[in-house]
Amino acid sequence: MKEKGGIPLLKRMMIMLALGVALGTLSGVEAKSAAHPKVLLAPTKVETITQETSVAQATPAVTNTEVKEEVKKENETQKPAFEDKRIEINLASKLLTLYQGDVGIRMYPIAPGKPSSPTPLGRRKVEDMEINPTWIDPDSDTKIPSGPDCPLGYRWIGIGGNYGIHGTNVASSIGTYASHGCVRMNEADVEDLFAHIVKGIPVDIIYERLVVEQAPDKTVIYYVYPDGYGRENLDVSDVKKRLSAFGVAGFADPDEVQHALAMADGDPNYVAKVYDLYLKGEKLKIHAYGKDGHIYLPVMALARAAGIQAEWSPNWKRISTAYGVANGLELGSAIYIDATDAPVLLHLTGHLNEKLDYELQ
């Protein structure tokens, strides 16, 4: 058959089809590029369609399979969402923390094993996950299906052997040593945890009565928990040693530390804030410290960094330089001045910037 003008209808339809596919290909690639800016390889495979270009040449550039393969390659180079997650269970604090990298993103109270049937320490991993588990009584083989009467609650996270993290039908046990070795959680908490993990992530079970951390506002805080398993004796020197890693051991009063050890109530004990210290734009290896509304500077090390000679009089508790004299505070092995004395003693003025760094000029 022919249309007017003598061009075969079938041939014309094939040419129009090729042109339509080409235009669709170009617009389709542009739309994909807008949504996925890193998927930019497809356009290099697209040829300009002419009457001489066969449909067979154009078709591979517009297949969904090719675009999906490109996206798949892109995704393979990205870290999976769960790759750097891990669970840490501290039996002393009776807390379970879910970490993303080094950042704790969720924390829940738990009920670990009784002293007579303690939860074992060590590294494990999530081996299986089950919704609506059935509990089997180890003594009678009686089966209790998931529900309000089931000791496992509605979620089971197996961590090897007969041990697991699960819900409970005895909510009052949370915060105590109550189980036969498993880790009980409040039902809402275990369901939340269940939704944010996958099989295979590590589970670290530790026993640490002393926990030290630094808050986002730079405050170093320590917590002392009871020795529920009778495994870890602590004294003031143990606390000081841990605090020294943050540079704040000198700011922890020994009497206050002793009181915290005696109470062992898990309440926060605030020591000092630790600020990175900059001198005329250069970051120093020393730090500024905030405590009780004051900022303290390690004066001898700071004076050396500024090229200023400073002398400490231990009897008078005073620091002197060519510029002036100021009171000093001896904490541990370092001498500090109040930052408000820096202009007089060192001809330097300072402030906290928005990143909570202390800058001196």
Regions inferred by a protein language model and the residue ranges of each:
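Cell wall/extracellular polymer interaction/catalysis modules
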Residues: 32-128, 209, 220-228, 244-268, ...
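Structured segments of extracytoplasmic/periplasmic soluble domains
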Residues: 99, 129-132, 188, 192-196, ...
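Solvent-exposed, acidic/flexible segments
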Residues: 89-92, 117-120, 150, 176-179, ...
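Solvent-exposed coil/turn segments that connect beta secondary-structure elements
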Residues: 92-94, 101-103, 113-115, 129-131, ...
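Sec-dependent N-terminal signal peptides
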Residues: 2-35
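Extracytoplasmic
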Residues: 82-84, 91-93, 105-107, 121-123, ...
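Primary recognition of N-terminal secretory signal peptides and signal-anchoring hydrophobic helices
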Residues: 6, 24-32, 254-361
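Exported/periplasmic cell-wall-interacting domains
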Residues: 20, 32-39, 45, 64-66, ...
